[in-house]
Amino acid sequence: MPAASPTRAGQAAETQALEYLQGQGLQLLARNWRCKGGELDLVMLDADTVVFVEVRYRLHAGFGGALDSIDGRKQKRLVLAASLFLQKEPHWGNHPCRFDVVALQGSHHAGRPLQWLKNAFEC
């Protein structure tokens, strides 16, 4: 059986992350929200808090693991995209916000534990 494309593997990781977070009580507001500033993988609501979730999947840790792949440049792009989301969806603007990261690593990640970092970085 051929290996899954990186795009498919990333989509599968996002689906796994979404299902996990929904199981933890979060509600989906948007998925793959795109703007000129970038893309938000998942935008969710945790009680009254708008949560911008970056899902990272890495097959190997050779160039750093999934969590290591979120550098300062990526954080700035996420903050910009989140700001644009809140401008386009002003009814969420008065809610507290946070940035979370869900990381999955390894082949056939379905069923493998994932790492959920709440408040992964400050903006």
UniProtKB/Swiss-Prot annotation:
Q: Report the domain of life of the source organism.
A: Bacteria
| Molecular function terms, GO-annotated | nucleic acid binding
SUPFAM superfamilies listed in its UniProt record = Restriction endonuclease-like
Q: Which CDD domains does the record cross-reference, listed alphabetically?
A: PoNe_Nuclease
UniProt-listed Pfam families:
UPF0102
Write down the NCBIfam families for this protein, in alphabetical order. Answer: PRK12497.1-3, YraN family protein
Protein family membership = Belongs to the UPF0102 family.
Protein name, per record: UPF0102 protein PputGB1_4524
Show the taxonomic lineage. Bacteria, Pseudomonadati, Pseudomonadota, Gammaproteobacteria, Pseudomonadales
